[in-house]
Amino acid sequence: MNVAQIIAAKRDGKILDDEDIRRLVAGYSDHSVPDYQMSAFAMAVYFQGMTTHETAVFTKCMVDSGERLEWPAGHTIVDKHSTGGIGDKVSIALAPLLACCGVRVPKISGRGLGVTGGTLDKMESITGYRTELKIDEFRSIVNKNGCSIASASKNLAPADKRLYALRDVTGTVPSPPLITASILSKKFAEGLDSLILDIKWGTGAFMKTIQQARELAELMVHVGNEMGVKTSALITDMNQPLGNMIGNAVEINEATDVLRGVGPSDVTQVVFALASRLLVQAGVHSNLKDSEHKLNQLIESG
């Protein structure tokens, strides 16, 4: 099928062949498929959805549109991703905390999407902090410091970078297949061993009901594990803002408060829940009790 036929097929609720999905993403990557056609496809997916297999193929094609990071043998590479919510500054505290546990966290983050603030926007409120890094520079920082938070290089999942911006202005943000493909394509391009997902639901999240969040979590975990990355998810409440501060600079302050042991209890609880489970999942600790004990030691010791 040509691109117009692919759009029409999805509009009518048909299941797309692998080759049709590959053709669409490849065309979008080389700019032979314009934004208006991809917008139409995104809206068709929003209303008709995708099967788990379609989503997995779409995700793989997004990864294959660019490079993948490679890491030295013997290092455990992990990451976390949140679907976003009001006041969500968890990643800013979580990445360095995980790095102190001996794993490496190459955190590729995004900008504000819909009503939620983006981690990159928050990090850029730190004077002199650069989020636009070349792949070699990003890799070097992670190898030296254990973690880095940066934007996706133009060579990492480039098709997603364009689609991510397109969804924000076309009313197609809250689509489980598109959310899954966007998040996981960036994560898989990082060269991860383990991934944990923070799927938020409620009035301040994209998923308004816990059932929607559960369905998204199941889809993402299935696709992630099918593609060879150990993947799990937590479903967390976003019916009220996370923490006490809303705004890029003040959320940085609140995240550092968590690392100093004086942060808001709700933010600290989410950080610890995600970190402890990810460390067990990655094989750093054998159980949650040991994992939580190590995290508490790190916070108390400064």
Indicate residue ranges for each PLM-predicted region.
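Alpha-helix C-terminal capping segments
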Residues: 47, 93-106, 186-191, 226-227, ...
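Functional cores that coordinate and move charged inorganic groups
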Residues: 195, 199-238
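A glycine- and small/hydrophobic-rich beta-loop-beta segment
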Residues: 4-15, 223, 230-302
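Active-site-proximal beta-alpha loop/turn segments in soluble metabolic enzymes
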Residues: 42-45, 160-169, 198-207, 238-241
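Glycine/serine-rich anion-binding loops at beta->alpha junctions
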Residues: 76-99, 103-115
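A glycine-rich helix N-cap at a beta->alpha junction
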Residues: 122-148, 218-224, 228
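Phosphate/diphosphate-binding glycine-rich loops and adjacent basic-rich segments that engage nucleotide
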Residues: 143-190
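Acidic, glycine/proline-rich low-complexity segments that act as flexible tails and inter-domain linkers
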Residues: 1-87
